[in-house]
């Protein structure tokens, strides 16, 4: 099974956040990061693997499904 690429990860993150009613500010607070930084990672402007893994874990997604 091929790994999902960044657009799949971005969509899945946004879907989980919407479904679970998690705001960017709440996610940023959980990860001790700024909301601007979180948005830039989610939208693909920053490719921080570590942050993507932490966002995935915080939202209950399997980070291994999104390895590029």
Spans of features found by a protein language model:
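DNA major-groove recognition helix of helix-turn-helix/homeodomain DNA-binding modules
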Residues: 50-65
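Recognition helix of helix-turn-helix/homeodomain-like DNA-binding domains
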Residues: 33-47
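Phosphate-coordinating loops and pocket residues in cytosolic domains that bind phosphorylated ligands
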Residues: 68
């Amino acid at each position: 099974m091929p790994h999902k690429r960044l657009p799949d990860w971005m969509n899945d993150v946004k879907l989980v956040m919407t479904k679970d009613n998690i705001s960017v500010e709440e996610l940023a607070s959980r990860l001790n990061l700024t909301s601007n930084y979180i948005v830039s990672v989610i939208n693909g402007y920053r490719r921080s693997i570590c942050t993507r893994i932490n966002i995935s874990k915080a939202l209950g997604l399997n980070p291994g499904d999104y390895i590029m």
